[in-house]
């Protein structure tokens, strides 16, 4: 059983993972997909609204990551210690995206630590409905650059300890 949470940490539902790890929440008109395996990732429907990655997912699978085909996404939740080898993450043009959650030690080689790697970059731009971004402790701790651009609805950005420790920040066209 897994409990899904909204961005404030409130439980919105409980469900038992099916073989497809996909559920439809009729109360909120949302389709949630919990990703634990590479094959589940490869089969994500473009109509998905909520994407939740398991702890440790994608740690050695990807060098870069983006989500251009998922125009209905409202939430992306990256589990703890996920996507450690991704050097470039770009989240752009997701017009319905409202919430991004990066859990502890996600997108970092330096688990519970920090080190400078000049080739790692995060870009989040052109997501007009994005209101909340949350970075867990040590997430992106070894990234060199973060760029947030054209996020007109952004209300809250929360940084845990040691996130983007060596980064240059660029916040532009935020309102």
For each predicted feature, which ranges?
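Residue-level signal for glycine
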Residues: 9-13, 148
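N-terminal segments that cap or nucleate solenoid repeat domains
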Residues: 19-81
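Conserved hydrophobic position(s) of the canonical leucine-rich repeat
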Residues: 48, 62, 73, 86, ...
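Position-specific detector for the leucine-rich repeat
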Residues: 57, 71, 82, 95-96, ...
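Leucine-rich repeat
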Residues: 60-63, 100-103, 129-136, 154-160
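Acidic/polar low-complexity surface segments
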Residues: 101-121, 161-174
């Amino acid at each position: 059983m897994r409990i899904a949470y909204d961005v404030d940490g409130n439980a919105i539902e409980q469900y038992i993972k099916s073989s497809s790890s996909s559920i439809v929440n009729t109360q909120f008109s949302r389709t949630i997909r919990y990703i634990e395996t590479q094959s589940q990732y490869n089969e994500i429907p473009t109509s998905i609204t909520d994407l939740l990655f398991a702890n440790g997912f994608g740690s050695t699978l990807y060098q870069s990551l983006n989500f251009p085909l998922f125009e209905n996404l409202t939430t992306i939740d990256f589990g703890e210690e996920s996507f450690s080898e991704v050097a470039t993450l770009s989240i752009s043009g997701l017009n319905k995206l409202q919430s991004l959650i990066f859990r502890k030690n996600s997108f970092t080689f330096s688990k519970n630590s920090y080190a400078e790697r000049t080739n790692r970059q995060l870009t989040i731009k052109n997501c007009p409905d994005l209101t909340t971004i949350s970075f867990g402790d040590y997430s992106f701790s070894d990234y060199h650059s973060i760029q947030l651009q054209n996020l007109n609805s952004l209300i809250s950005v929360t940084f845990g300890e040691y996130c983007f420790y060596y980064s240059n920040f660029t916040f532009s066209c935020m309102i």
